[in-house]
Amino acid sequence: MKVGELNVSEKIKEILRERGIEELYPPQAEALTSGVLEGENLLVAIPTASGKTLIAEIAIANKLLEEGGKAVYIVPLKALAEEKFREFKDWERLGLKVAMATGDYDSKDEWLGKYDIIIATAEKFDSLLRHGSSWIRDVKMLVIDEIHLIGSRDRGATLEFIITQMLGRAQIIGLSATIGNPEELAEWLNAKLIRSDWRPVKLRKGVFYQGFVFWEDGGSERYNSWEELVYDAVKKGKGALVFVNMRRKAEKTALELAKKVKNYLDRKELRELRELAESLEENPTNEKLAKALLSGVAFHHAGLGRDERVLVEDNFRKGLIKVVVATPTLSAGINTPAFRVIIRDTWRYSEFGMERIPVLEVQQMMGRAGRPRYDEVGEAIIVSTTEEPSLVIDHYIKGKPEKLFSQLSNESILRSQILALIATFGYSEFKEIYDFLERTFYAHQGKDPYMLEEKIRRIIYFLLENEFIEVTLEDEIKPLPLGVRTTKLYIDPMTAKIFKDTLPRIEKNPNPLGIFHMISLAPDLTPLSYSKRETSMLEDEYYSLMDRLYFELDYENERKFFRAFKTALVLNAWINEVPEGEIVERFNVEPGDIYRIVETAEWLIYSLGEIAKVLEASQEVVDYVNTLRLRVKHGIREELIPLMELPMVGRKRARALYNAGFKDLESIRNAKPSELLRIEGIGAKIVEGIFKYLGKEVKITERPRKGTLDYFLNP
């Protein structure tokens, strides 16, 4: 179908043509003539890289230009939100303003009312629904990217609640990978179903086993090892993406592959890769990444910092990085296709031991093979060490993806959502709550209504017993202040209960380690894991620091206790300005883990302060908690807090300023620019920015530092 045949405004067609799109892919054409442009709900279940996003973009632009209002585009990851935000900016030329909303769950974000297209994570949009943001009534379209995540143990229930809230209020488009039961999902959504196996790049699939690749079509090719598949791709001037099941394995495999990949690079590439490697901040994980980068190889996992992940993704897309070894996090929607995808592991560790990776996930990884506009064919190869190729082909290549099942039985999320129905949406009777849940995917799948009823009763009793709600003499359910604040803070009521129960102990003995340990035991924070080798260190630390903790060692839940304790130790080191590299080495963690727990800890400590206010804790405790939140946010000791206001000043520069005698904003305002320039890490641009912030305009010509080549040439 030609773009000119689309039943949309000429302005939309013009944007598409400027992108070089003259003709739509068959699934796109089918979707856009299904009734979606006339307002019908739509579920698109097609392979990766088949143009799902463009279907949504055209439908959104058409809807908003014709009817006005707003569209919300839900994504599973912040990184994906940033990617979509960049893609959607094209539509601003038609007057459709685009915004992105991810963090800060305790805000109405009324500023979003000025925008037409809002890209948000599921959790962020759920929190906006709870806050009753006024602009939500103007939402005419809701797009759920990666809607198959409704079957995810962790996040599926949140997605299900959002959709249930919006069904009937807005047009809904679901974008999905190929799933096992799309008809059932489409029926629940009251949506037209577009299902297709069509791909813009042909995909050749096979299994590597005992020195041969056995292709799905019956052919075979000889390779000495699976690594030869990587080297062969690089020799052909193409890229390879290798999926493994563990972070450590990703790092080790990348460094092994790097030894040989380097031989296939030219001088220009080696020079650019050296510049990339030198741009990384120093820490043990980045040292390994830099070593691999020098040879055109990288690893990618959740333990990398955000900047490092973006650097790897961008340079792999550009073709400078030839090989990426990744954990499956990279298959979760980020746009990083490669000519050849090699799936090294089809088993992974879970809390229940080793488990087979689902067909849906493996097929998503395989879908990363083949780059539109660059490759005529992509190759996806599963490595098997023990299983016969025919069995792997039957299970993963020819097998159907698993069916999606509602995760509403996840009691933690159900607890939070039932409180939200009462405290935010005004549900005041058991029957109203039950009727709402009857509209969910859970109920649509015919799950046991008696079991659901029992869960609702148990949760309401928990909320009543812990003073989140009350039941009036007329049998009406009413929210209490603790319940209202808990749901607005977007925390699990169980977390709020832990805060409430622990506050008297905090009043008596306020200290960071105790608070960090408490929040790490709460369900809203996933604590760090620890190895057997670390057990004796953690036990020794515990016995020397136990007087600071609010919880005693519970031998029945020893592992949970020590995971929380290790997390508390890392946070304690962070606020005492221990360098990031030292934290990584001392506690056997990755930079990405530090950023994750710091971000979550800041939110939970803020929530603790808010719960303390509701429960009328002493002002001293509220102030103490708020100060601790700032220390966690910036990774600093208390005396540096005033300096963190300054632009371009992080924990290192703030400490350098303080140690040089500039302990507050007034002392900096009265300083000479030359005095600040003498401080390590403070350059002309930073000094200009600081003085501008303090209301003083200065212009500095930066002189070269002593001991540099520039100083030698221009003293």
Curated annotation (Swiss-Prot):
Record bears the keyword Hydrolase: yes
Flavoprotein in keyword set: no
Gene3D superfamilies per UniProt: 1.10.3380.30, 5' to 3' exonuclease, C-terminal subdomain, P-loop containing nucleotide triphosphate hydrolases
Pfam families: DEAD (PF00270), Helicase_C (PF00271), Helicase_dom4_arc (PF21280), HHH_5 (PF14520)
EC id: 5.6.2.4
Position of sequence motif Q motif: 1-29
Cited InterPro entries: DEAD/DEAH_box_helicase_dom, Hel308-like_dom4, Hel308_SKI2-like, Helicase_ATP-bd, Helicase_C-like, Helicase_Hel308, Hlx-hairpin-Hlx_DNA-bd_motif, P-loop_NTPase
Transmembrane feature ranges: none
Organism domain of life: Archaea
UniProt-listed NCBIfam families: PRK00254.1 (NF001308)
Protein name in the entry: ATP-dependent DNA helicase Hel308
Organism this protein belongs to: Pyrococcus abyssi (strain GE5 / Orsay)
Taxonomic placement: Archaea, Methanobacteriati, Methanobacteriota, Thermococci, Thermococcales
